[in-house]
């Protein structure tokens, strides 16, 4: 029976719950695993761990599966959160969900699942895995492109993908909700989580301020005119419009203000007016810390598509260079607010090839 034993990551949400139910219907021996990956005061206004665990227990009872809780808080702190703080301190805007998937959900969690005698794991991610004719495992977009999460999974390798199931990859999100209601899941109408991976719905600036000091400095236009003061470069990201503190018209223009650049050396935040200001547009990018799903980079000169942020439409591009740990892309059309620290992820149609961290 162990050949059909699968450990499902249960978060308390509807996606992972339906994932467990679908696999049980397919004849798998399903074990549920609830991960606690953040240590905080359970009485915190924003801490949902206790309620999530109660939801998991209720779902497991309805589906008829065993469930256990495991604490990966130490691993998360060392492998994900430390990098998160380093990146923000350096003025970049990291995407912790990408690293969390590679290091926690598909490494620490996978290792624990194997210790339980399982051959595979499953999560409620919207993505697909298939084995190509050459034997390599491919990561593909979900059929429901509006919910596709392959962007967050692009750092998964062959060993991880070969032991992973994504049952929701071929199901529209609307149908997932319908299934949850039809089988009587208590969390069928629970809203989707939108906070940082495992940190929840806390106000982000308040959360970051607990770990990084504020270092106020000048806010300038490209011409060097001081138009305000920022609270610290770590608290802003390229393309940001809200929370800058520059409302109304300036210099006769009614256009909104956007964060355009950060100068760490002078602790200066540069802002511009207008969504399509030249400082917000770029036709090339460089990326490092590369990871390729098949273990090999794309060939220089290859044409494909890239995403530089989640939910962005695929942008046609050309691989200028991909050697060692350096990737350079050239886009057919200028890209808006390409942000250092975020991931540039390459696609060949629906196939996610991998990517790296924008420099």
UniProtKB/Swiss-Prot annotation:
Task: Cite the residue spans of the region called Interaction with target base in tRNA.
Answer: 95-97
Q: For this protein, what is the EC number? A: 2.8.1.13
Return any one Pfam family short name. Answer: tRNA_Me_trans_M
Q: List the disulfide bonds.
A: 100-197
Q: One cellular component GO annotation, for this chain's record?
A: cytoplasm
Query: One biological-process term from Gene Ontology?
Result: tRNA wobble position uridine thiolation
Instruction: Write the protein's name.
Output: tRNA-specific 2-thiouridylase MnmA
Per the record, the gene is: mnmA
